[in-house]
Amino acid sequence: MNKFCLLPFHGKRIGVANIPFTILFKKGPYFLHSHITAVYYSTKGKNDSHEQSRVSKKSTFTPLETPWYLRIVDNEKELMEGKKNNHHTMNKELEIPKTSPNSLRKIADLLTGKLGLDDFLVFDLRKKSPNSVSAVNKLGDFMVICTARSTKHCHKSFLELNKFLKHEFCSSAYVEGNFNERQESRRKRRLARKSNLSKLLGRSSECSAKDLNSEAWYMIDCRVDGIFVNILTQRRRNELNLEELYAPENEKSKFQNIDSGNVPTISGVNEISSNNNILLGLRRLAQQRRRYSTINPNGLSNLRYFLQKEDFKGANKIIQSSSGTETHNIRTLEHVKNTLKDLVGQERKVDVVQWKSLFDEHSTFLTINQSAAYWPLRLEYAILLNKADPQFYSDRVFLKDYLLLKKSLGQELIREDLIALLEMVLKTQHSSHSYFNLVKQNRVIIRALNLFKGLQTEDDGSVVYDEVVISLLLNSMVADERVKLRSLYETIDHIFQTFGDKLTSGMIVSILQNLAKIKDWNKLLQVWEAITPTEGEGQDKRPWNEFINVINQSGDSHVISKIVNNGHLLWIRRLNVNVTPELCNSIKALLKTAGMENSTLEEFLVRGTNNQ
């Protein structure tokens, strides 16, 4: 039987021993060992030295190793020193492109030092050949790729990086791939409703929800010096192989996966089909130059279904559930516009108030900033609203809802904007063609023209002096034979003084038509003779065909006889006018109305010209 033995201590001596001490259990007797030899103090005389030496020999033992709980602090110190050494080594090996901004160095130190991200790579996208330009080249200058240990590590790294950017550069990062708890729970519910995960995720059916949640890819736009940061888990990084996408042409071979079977994937399948190859899809996006929509086709069909039924609550839910980037919002608004265009083309009665509210609700400031795509879309949408209900969406509403809004947001008005307003003014119907209603319309035009002061066209001319604009302005000054603005004649005289011999055919035709509409034939002939070239100037290029048609359509026999008998038509031969088949038909119709069909004058004007 094993015995437990203790060292003998003498009763007349006081012993003090330092702790700790241990009890060693062996097959033999149990002994109590102390690290330090015990020191004793005695009150005896000379015999104390002999007794003390005897006890000291018995109390001297072999020292043991330092216990684990005393080695914890030392181990932590060694670990911290090792991390510091590794960090210094990593900083030495960290390759940053030359002439890169200091912000890139600070971000790199944060990612590799404090956040502990591995496999740090930086690609300089500033100098690329035109043949290898992708969408990322136009967005950023530096592409950073690094590896995290888990999805939580990715998320934590993004949060710390965002805090760092706000503190150091006063910039807020934009991230793709960051799923919050609500989105993640919604994602899990959708996966639970799907029996075939491969159709939903584009991966092998062996993939599970656990595998999906264990991998992550955060793409972060730092909004500082064109720096983009990609934080991926190791498996996702191996699968995507973004290095091959962003590397220069002469270095792509370094990052190519020679044996795809050795690359770990989420599904664990060695063979990757072309439909499931994410890198192949990224290559296509980089090489092609087309506008790409991220809207789900099913979502588009559902949105169209609700819009055709004018169920705006359901349409709002679909748009809000699929909200994304500014380009995505432009696509959605364009789809709304196309649906309204189809309904208006079918002459269906639509709720213009709800359609306008739907478009305005989803026209955010970020979407409006996409001026190249947004404002032409809004202009076309406004024209459709006016066509659907001119009384509700009138010219005055268009002036405030489009022209003033666009001008107040710092956007430049263009020629098409003014033309759209003038066309709406002409379409607006009033209960009676009175002079006061015409004045009201003219006030809207005056307010609009004040917004276009100083604007130039592509030909360095004023927008107001555009040929189409002048024609529409003249048409807006005349309602019928009895109602016209008093400024009509002043406007015509101003046009003649401004353009002189450079009057275009469109301007001349518009002046003739409006004078014929008010039946002011004397002013019409005065204008026509004022632009008559002399015989030495060459061929007459006035719009003779339109002039004769205006006279013939008036149906006034007195005016027609005056044109024929006073010799106005003889100028066609005198000035070598190019007699086209259309002009021949117009001359015959005019002479037939005047009762001079098959006359000598017709033979002289038409047949004589044909013989030449």
Swiss-Prot record:
Residues 1-14 form a transit peptide. Keywords: Membrane, Mitochondrion, Mitochondrion inner membrane, Transit peptide. It is a peripheral membrane protein. The keyword Manganese does not apply. GO terms for biological process: mitochondrial gene expression; mitochondrial proton-transporting ATP synthase complex assembly; mRNA stabilization. Its main location: mitochondrion. It comes from the Eukaryota. One of its GO terms (cellular component) is mitochondrion. It holds the Pfam family RsfS. It is found in: Mitochondrion inner membrane. Present with 2430 molecules/cell in log phase SD medium. mRNA stabilization factor specific for the 0.95 kb OLI1 mRNA. Also involved in OLI1 ring formation. Belongs to the ATP25 family. This is ATPase synthesis protein 25, mitochondrial. It comes from Saccharomyces cerevisiae (strain ATCC 204508 / S288c).
